[in-house]
Design a protein with these regions (language model features):
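Generic N-terminal helix/loop capping motif
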Residues: 1, 5, 25, 233-236, ...
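Class I S-adenosyl-L-methionine
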Residues: 2-182
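C-terminal target-recognition/interaction regions appended to catalytic cores
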Residues: 135-276
């Protein structure tokens, strides 16, 4: 639909009209407040036609609406993930939350304490191998007694051989041209950088060729638990189902720490209304 990946079909893509179905539920349920999240392209695709249609429909339903782009890294999430948000209320125009931190958490902060697995290693349930090495890791562990979903993809040998050619924190520029394949995006075969937030976690984070979602130095893509940490799901979240469903649960989610910041902002706005 609106994503930077794949074709941008705009008005010719039926997925871009799913907002109408969502707003039909709003019309039926009449919540006091609701939030819409989507990729930032929803604001600009087809010269802003979809953005304007969404706002017009929300207003017609009797809601105030404020919208803008928020980056998860500004809210304590160790990931640079920009998304468009529409915050809608029957009572007043809601402000978007302000950033909660100017010091961005990093990949190292998020996953350095997790077992260093090779391709195909790990289990759905395992034990921690070290004490937490950062405040974020302590926060992630909460009171979890075990580690769940820390199981590495079993890559084909050709993928492992390619990753062995890529130095720590580097990318496909180190691969011979005859091994690049058909991937067009610059980020394919990329490794995460320890001391930076990760790029956006998507629903194919366990594929070595997908993007910059390979371990900083190990020859594999990140595990579901590592991806969950980078999304700010704490270790008590257990992801169930087939691999494809687990990837979608993690990669399609609004990071919990960002969701909390939005919820806190809405709560503050309603406290002001009650005081008035």
């Amino acid at each position: 639909g609106f994503s930077n990946k794949g074709k941008k079909l705009g008005l010719d893509d039926s997925r871009n009209f799913l907002f109408r179905e969502f707003l039909e539920f709003v019309e039926c349920l009449e919540p006091e407040v609701f939030v819409i999240e989507n990729v930032r392209g929803i604001l600009t695709t087809s010269n802003g036609w979809f953005r304007d249609q969404i706002i017009h429909k929300i207003n017609d339903l009797g809601y105030y609406v404020n919208y803008g782009i928020l980056n998860s890294r500004d809210f304590g999430v160790p990931q640079s993930r920009e998304r468009a948000f529409f915050i809608c209320s029957k009572s007043k125009m809601m402000r978007l939350p302000k950033e909660t931190t100017s010091k961005h958490r990093t990949v190292r902060d998020a996953i350095e304490d997790l077992a260093y697995l090779n391709s195909g290693e790990g289990d759905e349930i395992s034990n921690y191998v070290t004490e937490p090495l950062s405040s974020y890791q302590r926060y992630m562990r909460k009171d979890s007694k075990h580690l769940f979903n820390h199981k590495a993809s079993n890559h084909k040998q050709i993928a492992i051989e390619k990753l062995k050619m890529i130095p720590p924190e580097k990318g496909k520029e180190y691969l011979p041209k005859d091994m690049l394949g058909k991937q067009l995006f610059k980020s394919t075969w990329g490794r995460l950088k320890w001391d930076e937030p990760s790029p956006t976690i998507d629903t194919r984070f366990d594929a070595a060729s997908n993007g910059t979602n390979n371990h900083p130095f190990l020859h594999r893509a990140i595990t579901p638990r590592e991806a969950a940490r980078l999304q700010s799901f704490d270790d008590r979240f257990i992801f169930l189902g087939a691999k494809v469903h687990i990837r979608k649960q993690i990669g399609n989610a609004v990071p919990p720490l960002l969701a909390k910041a939005i919820a806190d902002q809405i709560s503050k706005e309603y406290l002001v209304i009650e005081e008035e």
